[in-house]
Regions:
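Active-site-flanking beta-strand signature of metal-NTP-handling nucleotidyl enzymes
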Residues: 4-10, 53
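Short, surface-exposed ligand-recognition loops at beta-strand->loop->(often short) alpha-helix junctions
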Residues: 10-23
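An amphipathic, aromatic/His-enriched active-site/gating alpha helix that lines ligand/cofactor pockets
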Residues: 25-39, 47, 57-91
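A short, glycine/Asx- and small/polar-enriched loop/turn
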Residues: 48-52
Length: 96
């Protein structure tokens, strides 16, 4: 059963959000090199530009854990950025 995970990160300022976005630019290549197939979208709020929304789709719980473990190991995000983070996890009921 597919899983959708939405994470809303609110950074202290626009520069921190843009740093996160620039680091995230290499995410797809890293996942491909690790042979991890995951669908994701990373977007920036137009009304609150220091806010970044990530939407990930995983095949199942094991796949989610594997991808998240890889991303955590690859993270170059300084702890000093420490965004406020809210995450939502759902199971997919209908999809097209």
């Amino acid at each position: 059963m597919a899983i959708i995970r939405v994470t809303v990160r609110t950074f202290q300022n626009l520069e921190h959000a843009e740093l996160f976005l620039s680091i995230g630019a290499s995410t797809k290549d890293g996942l491909n090199k690790a042979s991890l197939d995951a669908k994701f979208t990373i977007s920036q709020s137009t009304s609150q530009p220091n806010q970044v929304v990530s939407v990930w789709e995983y095949k199942d719980k094991d796949h989610m854990n594997e991808v998240r473990k890889f991303l955590s190991a690859q993270s170059r995000l300084p702890n000093s950025l420490a965004p406020k983070e809210i995450a939502y996890e759902t199971k997919v009921i209908h999809s097209s």
